[in-house]
């Protein structure tokens, strides 16, 4: 103990010297790119940009800037793939600090329309060389660079005010091979990793699922068909219905092609650039480099059964409903341990004081009669508690056929604030664990439009069977069996008071209640984050953060790649434009050291 405390004070002394030394200067990124309001920029920097980006460089304006001259803007605003400036959660197109926005629902015919957090310029790239040129341009001019694939981000990480956007949606290509051999240093012979598929950064999950169904294989992917599978989904960990049986998205990555902050294209796998390979697989998107393609392990196709329960509690959030949630929580680890997946959504406050619950179960690799028995028993118990339950079951000869069913365009242009925490298998399978979770959720307050998600597809045999150090995600993924998400619906048209109220409720009441379930030992999912986490390093990476921060300094010493909540973001202001002062940086560093000492003495 004395040795540990002595080490702490030594670190503290060194830290004081580092953070208050004269060479730790604050600085801001340049704004010369945006020195003109002309539609055709005339600054020297923009002349250079137009040269390297033509024909793909463009001025970016908020979607509704064209309203009402283009009436279709209002309806197209809910299309995920509409335009480079559009984000799935359009509250991140607004600037809360400046109270600036541009929204059709709140825009008078001749009213003001502000840029908000929408990038000023966008470079739509469709080749590795184009990515390299844009990165070199941004680095040479010290610009704020934001990487956007499809704009599916719940914390505003694919956009930033006063930024240049690297739009990777044009990096298409799906290449399936029966035997994939990773690239290795010259003279080194490596074995084949078996069947695999290489996808460009712009390939959507639905596009890959369609290609897989045609070729007869399956691949681990998410539930949203318009998410770029090689982007933030994979780089944040990535889970889906195959995760319990096949692992997380990052567990199935064999090779990554990435452009570094120096504009150099490199290959990262288990044979070369291993540190970068580790960091990208869970360290967060837009942080260590611009990923241009990823090779995923594939699996043979298999039968599957999809079961759905639509549950209505006619008396709302009464004790019978929460007892039914306890029943569901007991069933989830049973199914997940079999390699199956469960996804449940609760709409707590609906018209007429009713509560809706939908449960989808994915039984993989066989008809799973015993798995269906679990679900049928769950249905009976819910009905016995006075809930109305409608059920359906559909079997598929091939799982790939189900995954490839067109899902339509995912809803965009919506307002939402979320927070998530992982829940351990140990708690879920304990005698009192499910009741404790249910009672905790019952004590929270809910408003119309709130959503509660219980996803039993983050853990399972394939996740537990891997070493914690194999991936950069929070170590608690190893023991997790469920992700619990709280969602607050927000007005799409800017309502600054509503935004603050949702943030306060999540930060002060709801998240602390979830944290207390397991004394803060479980992390959160970076893909569904609370945008205002006070300690993102602790929540999303835990003990892996120190190594990630070291690798960030090695591969991107100037923090060209930066996102909200991302590795290294504590060194910058909220939008990544200016480095924070020495005192503020020290306070963050000091709090992390105190946390470490507390863990030593616990």
From Swiss-Prot:
One of its GO terms (molecular function) is FAD binding. It is an enzyme of class 1 (oxidoreductase). Residues 1-17 form the signal peptide. InterPro entries: BBE, FAD-bd_PCMH, FAD-bd_PCMH-like_sf, FAD-bd_PCMH_sub2, FAD-linked_Oxidoreductase, Oxid_FAD_bind_N. One of its GO terms (biological process) is alkaloid metabolic process. Residues 114-301 form the FAD-binding PCMH-type domain. This is FAD-linked oxidoreductase phqH. It comes from Penicillium fellutanum. The gene is phqH.
């Amino acid at each position: 103990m004395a040795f540990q405390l002595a080490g702490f004070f030594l670190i503290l002394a060194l830290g004081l010297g580092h953070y208050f030394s004269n060479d730790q200067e604050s600085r801001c990124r340049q704004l010369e790119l945006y020195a003109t309001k002309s539609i055709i920029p005339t600054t020297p920097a923009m002349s250079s940009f137009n040269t390297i980006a033509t024909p793909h460089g463009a001025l970016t304006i908020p979607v509704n800037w064209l309203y009402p001259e283009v009436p279709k803007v209002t309806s197209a605003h809910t299309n995920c793939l509409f335009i480079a400036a559009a984000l799935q959660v359009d509250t991140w197109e607004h600037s809360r600090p400046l109270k600036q926005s541009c929204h059709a629902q709140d825009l008078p015919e001749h009213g003001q329309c502000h840029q908000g957090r929408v990038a000023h310029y966008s470079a739509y790239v469709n080749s590795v060389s184009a990515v390299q040129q844009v990165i070199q341009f941004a680095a040479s001019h010290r610009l704020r660079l934001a990487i956007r694939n499809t704009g599916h981000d719940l914390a505003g990480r694919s956009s930033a005010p006063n930024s240049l956007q690297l739009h990777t949606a044009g990096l298409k290509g799906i290449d399936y091979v029966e035997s994939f051999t990773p690239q290795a240093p010259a003279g080194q012979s490596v074995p084949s990793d078996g069947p695999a598929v290489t996808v460009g950064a712009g390939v959507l999950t639905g596009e890959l699922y369609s290609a897989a169904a045609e070729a007869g294989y399956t691949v681990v992917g998410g539930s949203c068909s318009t998410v770029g599978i090689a982007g933030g989904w994979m780089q944040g960990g990535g889970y889906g219905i195959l995760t319990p049986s096949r692992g997380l998205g990052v567990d199935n990555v064999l090779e990554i092609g990435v452009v570094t902050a120096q504009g150099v294209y490199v290959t990262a796998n288990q044979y070369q650039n291993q540190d970068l390979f580790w960091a990208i697989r869970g360290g967060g998107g837009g942080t260590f480099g611009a990923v241009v393609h990823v090779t995923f392990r594939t699996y043979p196709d298999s039968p599957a059964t999809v079961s759905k329960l639509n549950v209505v509690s006619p008396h709302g959030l009464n004790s019978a409903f929460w007892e039914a949630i306890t029943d569901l929580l007991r069933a989830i680890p049973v199914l997940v341990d079999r390699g199956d997946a469960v996804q449940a959504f609760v709409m707590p406050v609906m018209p007429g004081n009713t509560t809706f619950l939908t449960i989808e179960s994915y039984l993989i690799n066989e008809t799973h009669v015993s798995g269906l028995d679990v679900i049928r028993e769950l249905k009976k118990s819910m009905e016995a508690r006075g809930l109305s339950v409608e059920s359906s079951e559909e079997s598929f000869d091939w799982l790939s056929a189900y995954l490839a069913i067109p899902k339509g365009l995912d809803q965009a242009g919506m307002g939402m604030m979320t927070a998530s925490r992982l829940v351990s298998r140990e708690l879920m399978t304990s005698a009192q664990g499910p009741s404790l979770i249910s009672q905790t959720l019952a004590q929270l307050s809910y408003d119309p439009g709130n959503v509660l998600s219980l996803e039993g597809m983050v853990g399972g045999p394939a996740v537990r069977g891997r070493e914690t150090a194999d991936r950069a995600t929070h170590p608690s993924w190893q023991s997790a069996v469920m992700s619990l998400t709280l969602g607050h619906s927000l007005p799409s048209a800017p309502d600054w008071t509503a935004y603050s109220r949702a943030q306060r409720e999540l930060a002060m009441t709801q998240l602390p209640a979830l944290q207390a379930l397991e004394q803060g030992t479980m992390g959160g999912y970076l893909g569904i984050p609370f945008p205002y986490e006070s300690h993102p390093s602790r929540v999303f990476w835990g003990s892996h953060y120190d190594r990630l921060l070291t690798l960030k300094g090695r591969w991107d010493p100037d923090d060209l790649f930066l996102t909200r909540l991302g590795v290294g973001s504590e060194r910058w202001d909220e939008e990544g434009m200016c480095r924070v002062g020495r005192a503020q940086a020290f306070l963050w560093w000091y709090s992390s050291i105190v946390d470490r000492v507390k863990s030593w003495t616990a």
